[in-house]
Amino acid sequence: RDGYWSRGLGDVYKRQVNEGIWQVDRGIAQLSQLSPQGDEILLGWAQPGTFFGSWLTFVNSYQVKGLSNLYLKWYGIEDLSNSAELSQMAFSQLARRMRQTEALLAISGLKRVEDRLQQLLYLLQQELGESTKEGTRIKVRLTHQNLANAIATTRVTVTRLLGEFQRQGWLGFDSDRHIIITSVKFHSYSKSDANFN
């Protein structure tokens, strides 16, 4: 029952949703829901080891989008019931997802868009960052619209703020347009200002 989905495909969650859960084996997925107006609301990210599926959520308009190519494993409810090791693994990953969701809720409560974007970048640095000689590189390429949807603002505003951060030397982009957090100043500011750490 394992599966492969190419980057961007958003209907993974529709497969066998009432019988069990998916686990990311390789790749990164974005978890979201749609508002009544059709806007995307970010719920978090699923990395290798993360479990997801409609069986684990009350959200009706649950969506899963591959930020990279996804390799997934499928587990039925009976698999979880019969394996203490698998159940413990699922519990550990769900606890991590809960912390991630709490951080996103804290970000959404910040009044200034600039603060929301800074805290989102800091969370991305923690969750999806990898160390390089230039700084911390976000492992997936996020569009300005992705970031705007995550903090309830416009793409134009995100583009303007990213330009300001880049001029201030806080971040940059690699040749594939992945965000790179380049400055200790950004890390220190974000950590001291964040109310979810």
Regions from the PLM with identified roles:
Residues 2-13:
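Single conserved hydrophobic/aromatic residue that forms the stacking wall/gate
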Residues 11-21, 39-40, 58-60, 135:
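A short beta-loop-beta micro-motif enriched in histidine and acidic residues
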